[in-house]
């Protein structure tokens, strides 16, 4: 009996995955005019610790940003934006401020730029996330663009360089999110596990999502 139930669950997860991808693709076409669903492997995993480009589902992003109160003065950056699913979601939700994405893989960044160029409030940067100044932004987001060692280096960069407080959204945080839990200036506002919504599985496995604030020493 248990084997039958396991088979049914497995088939339902597969059907859920196909349905969610179909829904996401339809949303992409409406907002971007192209699909953002295809995974792109990173050529920089071994050298720079950069993970591949995958698109977080719109339903997952609804939960990630649930309750967010964005303002016209907000400046948002998605670190490791890939083809721009987070950017597309923010457009759908009528984000009132400035939206930026930075992507290390030039080909992926160009794909994102191609559809995003028609929106005046979006800027897509093709480049290394370790080489820009984050004082231009007050909201940072990432969907696990780095392996744990590089995530730690990125956090240390923020702590060294930021001169004003930020809000930080971290999706797929289970590998390295704990690194910032007890560091000075960091405060967790919320954490949740995302796996199912509307009766459908959102991902292959449950994913952690946390929301933080960071206040630099000069602002405490």
Task: Please state what every model-predicted region is.
Residues 1-71:
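S-adenosyl-L-methionine
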Residues 73-82:
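Conserved class I S-adenosyl-L-methionine
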Residues 84-88:
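Glycine-rich SAM-binding Motif I of class I
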Residues 92-98:
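Conserved S-adenosyl-L-methionine
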Residues 105:
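Conserved SAM/SAH-binding beta-strand->alpha-helix loop
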Residues 112:
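Conserved SAM-binding loop
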Residues 119-128:
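Conserved SAM-binding strand-loop segment of SAM-dependent methyltransferases
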Residues 149-210:
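C-terminal substrate-binding/active-site "lid" region of AdoMet-derived donor-dependent transferases
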């Amino acid at each position: 009996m248990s084997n039958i139930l396991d088979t049914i669950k497995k088939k339902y997860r597969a059907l859920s995955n196909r349905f969610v991808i179909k829904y996401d693709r339809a949303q992409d076409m409406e907002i971007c005019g192209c699909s953002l669903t295809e995974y792109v492997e990173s050529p920089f995993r071994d050298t720079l610790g950069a993970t591949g480009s995958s698109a977080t589902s719109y339903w997952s992003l609804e939960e990630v940003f649930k309750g967010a109160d964005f303002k016209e003065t907000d400046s948002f950056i998605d670190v490791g934006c890939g083809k721009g699913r987070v950017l597309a979601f923010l457009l759908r939700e009528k984000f009132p401020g400035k939206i930026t994405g930075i992507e290390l893989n030039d080909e992926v960044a160009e794909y994102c730029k191609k559809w995003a160029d028609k929106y005046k409030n979006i800027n897509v940067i093709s480049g290394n996330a370790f080489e820009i100044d984050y004082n231009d932004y007050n909201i940072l987001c990432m969907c696990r663009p780095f392996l744990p060692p590089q995530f730690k280096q990125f956090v240390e960069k923020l702590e060294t360089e930021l001169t004003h407080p930020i809000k930080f959204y971290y999706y797929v945080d289970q590998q390295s999110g704990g690194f910032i839990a007890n560091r000075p200036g960091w405060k967790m506002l919320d954490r949740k596990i995302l796996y199912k919504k509307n009766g459908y599985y959102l991902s292959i496995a449950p994913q952690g999502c946390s929301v933080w604030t960071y206040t630099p020493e000069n602002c405490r």
